[in-house]
């Protein structure tokens, strides 16, 4: 069984790096690459996802605000350079 991953980041280079590394890990499958939280919500509503790689600073709806809207979120890995957001993300999931 593969770990189904969703990548959410508004920076194309960050998405590319994450996708590249995940493609080299056996047992993972990328279910989508999204530039904002609204695109991610569409994927979550249409495909099974086990793990989200979520950037904090997103257009339209910030990563933490998006995470708070999910009633039963999959596991989440926060991708940020700001430790205070990482701690808040850990507390939410």
Tell me what each language-model feature is.
Residues 1-4:
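Non-catalytic signal-transmission and effector/linker regions of two-component phosphorelay proteins
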Residues 41-43, 47-93:
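CheY-like receiver
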Residues 36-40:
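Short alpha-helical segment
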Residues 10-12, 56:
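Generic detector of well-ordered alpha-helical packing
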Residues 12-32:
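Two-component/phosphorelay signaling modules centered on CheY-like receiver
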Residues 8-9, 34, 52:
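Conserved sequence signature across two-component system core domains
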């Amino acid at each position: 069984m593969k770990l189904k991953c969703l990548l959410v980041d508004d920076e194309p280079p960050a998405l590319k790096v994450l996708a590249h590394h995940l493609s080299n890990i056996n047992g993972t499958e990328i279910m989508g690459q999204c530039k904002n939280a609204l695109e991610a919500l569409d994927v979550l509503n249409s495909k099974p996802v086990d793990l989200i790689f979520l950037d904090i600073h997103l257009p339209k709806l910030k990563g933490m605000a998006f995470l708070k809207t999910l009633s039963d979120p999959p596991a989440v890995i926060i991708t940020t350079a700001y430790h205070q957001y990482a701690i808040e993300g850990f507390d939410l999931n």
